[in-house]
Amino acid sequence: MKKIWIILCCILLVGCTSTKSDMSQYENFHDENHVFYDMTVKELQSKIQNKETLTVYFGFSKCPSCIEAMPVLNDVAKENHAEVAYINTRKNAAWQSNMDMKDYDVVVNLFGQYLQYDDNGKKHLYTPHVFFIKDGDVVYEVEGVNEQLKENYEKGFALEYE
């Protein structure tokens, strides 16, 4: 019986571990101890429904603004001893738009009030986009890049963990 218990605990631990994101495609980013871990939209949806606290970053490696924002987010997250869920919006090479991403409709359901409308009148997730979620609710979000990017990320983590 004790062996069965140990085996079950090991299975649970393995099933609960996060997969570190492969950020090697991001130009000029070489931090092997980065804070990013892979997450699917469905996993994110589950965490929000379970009222969890997390930071999620939507982006992709060929996005110029993502290339600029990602190292800043990495540094600020490290300063706050936080990890960041990464959802690669162009994981599949056939995806030509963030709207092609798997479960995009779920993203619109979860974050629609924070998304802008595109030229066709559809809600569009522009990248980079970071959501700071506390107890299942968005407490802060940062879209794109600006001169106060570091300060914006710091504010998001402060609100998330206050």
Predicted regions and their residues:
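Positively charged n-region of N-terminal signal peptides that target proteins for export
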Residues: 1-4
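Bacterial signal peptide processing site
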Residues: 17-20
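Non-catalytic, surface beta->alpha helical segment in thiol-disulfide oxidoreductase systems
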Residues: 120-162
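Thiol-based oxidoreductase modules, predominantly thioredoxin-like and allied folds used
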Residues: 82-109
